[in-house]
Amino acid sequence: MEVKTFAFLQIAVFIALGIQIFAAVTAAADANEEVFTVEYCGMNCTQKSDGTWTECSGKNKDCRCYHESDAREGLCLSTEYTDFSQFETPSNSDLEAATPRPRKTLYPVRNPHGPKTRGLGYDKRILRDRVKFLI
């Protein structure tokens, strides 16, 4: 009875330890500020009879042929490595400066009793005042 209890406790400790290690490794991988992206270029590549590979002329100039060791067919892929640790963390003023702003345009005036006003859909008085302001 004591042996079974001791074995059960050992198994429980090993499971808990395994979960803890898995969580720590996963968190460490997420903290890494490096990104490796792969994009399919929209075409495949094949090995020619002389041993060279067909050119990859896909979406961008960085497309290269990637294939398994003995395969005669491969995929044209574009790879990019970005190390975000080289960039500073943006401040609030940087984020505020990068926030998109609405364009300044003439907005249509809606009639509360029906569709837009006749003509261009703009109140002529507002347009006249804005044009005078611009001149």
From Swiss-Prot:
One of its GO terms (cellular component) is extracellular region. Disulfide bonds join 41-63, 45-65, 56-76. It comes from Ixodes ricinus. Glycans are attached at residue 44. Residues 88-112 are annotated as: Disordered. Keywords: Disulfide bond, Glycoprotein, Secreted, Signal. Coiled coil: none annotated. It is found in: Secreted. GO terms for molecular function: C-X-C chemokine binding. Residues 1-31 form the signal peptide. This is Evasin P1134. The lineage of its organism: Eukaryota, Metazoa, Ecdysozoa, Arthropoda, Chelicerata. It comes from the Eukaryota. Salivary chemokine-binding protein which binds to host chemokine CXCL1.
